């Protein structure tokens, strides 16, 4: 099993990245909470990983912190929650936020995540409550004010919007819904990562 990788970030298009590890290119899927922590393309980064083998594909998921990976692994143990839905959950909430939602039984917040209906949310509450006592000690939630802002031209802004919408669709949102979410928070000085972050935060 591949537990951790260190390499040069070659490409990033949320939620996917390409990492060059000693000449071998690894494609990884990241939750947005980890994607926000990535360096610029061309720089080195280290990610904790989880490898999923399916009949039709081999998927490698990457995480900035062990706690994120631990939560991902707990999520996919839950009946009805696969890797794609677990990725959507971790993209919508930080570890602390999710743990708090479970412990406080905030069903209304959980059902706002794409792919999480009432039955799935109830199942998460039943199966996961009380399991995360060691996970909520450190907050990995990065505030948008800590993310670098870049002034964008109208063309750049259109590109940022398209990238943000594509990322939300990949996370399970419907195209029309994703576009509305991004346009609702659209500002000239926000990067695509910041737009995704603000759109997900506003959706909850």
UniProtKB/Swiss-Prot annotation:
<dbReference type="GO" id="GO:0000400">
    <property type="term" value="F:four-way junction DNA binding"/>
</dbReference>
<dbReference type="Pfam" id="PF14520">
    <property type="entry name" value="HHH_5"/>
</dbReference>
<dbReference type="GO" id="GO:0005524">
    <property type="term" value="F:ATP binding"/>
</dbReference>
<keyword id="KW-0238">DNA-binding</keyword>
<comment type="subunit">
    <text>Homotetramer. Forms an RuvA(8)-RuvB(12)-Holliday junction (HJ) complex. HJ DNA is sandwiched between 2 RuvA tetramers; dsDNA enters through RuvA and exits via RuvB. An RuvB hexamer assembles on each DNA strand where it exits the tetramer. Each RuvB hexamer is contacted by two RuvA subunits (via domain III) on 2 adjacent RuvB subunits; this complex drives branch migration. In the full resolvosome a probable DNA-RuvA(4)-RuvB(12)-RuvC(2) complex forms which resolves the HJ.</text>
</comment>
<dbReference type="InterPro" id="IPR012340">
    <property type="entry name" value="NA-bd_OB-fold"/>
</dbReference>
<keyword id="KW-0227">DNA damage</keyword>
<dbReference type="InterPro" id="IPR011114">
    <property type="entry name" value="RuvA_C"/>
</dbReference>
<feature type="region of interest" description="Flexible linker">
    <location>
        <begin position="144"/>
        <end position="155"/>
    </location>
</feature>
<feature type="region of interest" description="Domain III">
    <location>
        <begin position="156"/>
        <end position="204"/>
    </location>
</feature>
<comment type="similarity">
    <text>Belongs to the RuvA family.</text>
</comment>
<dbReference type="GO" id="GO:0006310">
    <property type="term" value="P:DNA recombination"/>
</dbReference>
<dbReference type="Pfam" id="PF01330">
    <property type="entry name" value="RuvA_N"/>
</dbReference>
<dbReference type="GO" id="GO:0005737">
    <property type="term" value="C:cytoplasm"/>
</dbReference>
<keyword id="KW-0963">Cytoplasm</keyword>
<feature type="region of interest" description="Domain I">
    <location>
        <begin position="1"/>
        <end position="64"/>
    </location>
</feature>
<keyword id="KW-0233">DNA recombination</keyword>
<dbReference type="InterPro" id="IPR003583">
    <property type="entry name" value="Hlx-hairpin-Hlx_DNA-bd_motif"/>
</dbReference>
<dbReference type="GO" id="GO:0009379">
    <property type="term" value="C:Holliday junction helicase complex"/>
</dbReference>
<keyword id="KW-0234">DNA repair</keyword>
<dbReference type="InterPro" id="IPR013849">
    <property type="entry name" value="DNA_helicase_Holl-junc_RuvA_I"/>
</dbReference>
<dbReference type="Pfam" id="PF07499">
    <property type="entry name" value="RuvA_C"/>
</dbReference>
<dbReference type="GO" id="GO:0006281">
    <property type="term" value="P:DNA repair"/>
</dbReference>
<comment type="function">
    <text>The RuvA-RuvB-RuvC complex processes Holliday junction (HJ) DNA during genetic recombination and DNA repair, while the RuvA-RuvB complex plays an important role in the rescue of blocked DNA replication forks via replication fork reversal (RFR). RuvA specifically binds to HJ cruciform DNA, conferring on it an open structure. The RuvB hexamer acts as an ATP-dependent pump, pulling dsDNA into and through the RuvAB complex. HJ branch migration allows RuvC to scan DNA until it finds its consensus sequence, where it cleaves and resolves the cruciform DNA.</text>
</comment>
<protein>
    <recommendedName>
        <fullName>Holliday junction branch migration complex subunit RuvA</fullName>
    </recommendedName>
</protein>
<dbReference type="InterPro" id="IPR000085">
    <property type="entry name" value="RuvA"/>
</dbReference>
<dbReference type="InterPro" id="IPR010994">
    <property type="entry name" value="RuvA_2-like"/>
</dbReference>
<dbReference type="InterPro" id="IPR036267">
    <property type="entry name" value="RuvA_C_sf"/>
</dbReference>
<dbReference type="GO" id="GO:0009378">
    <property type="term" value="F:four-way junction helicase activity"/>
</dbReference>
<dbReference type="GO" id="GO:0048476">
    <property type="term" value="C:Holliday junction resolvase complex"/>
</dbReference>
<feature type="region of interest" description="Domain II">
    <location>
        <begin position="65"/>
        <end position="143"/>
    </location>
</feature>
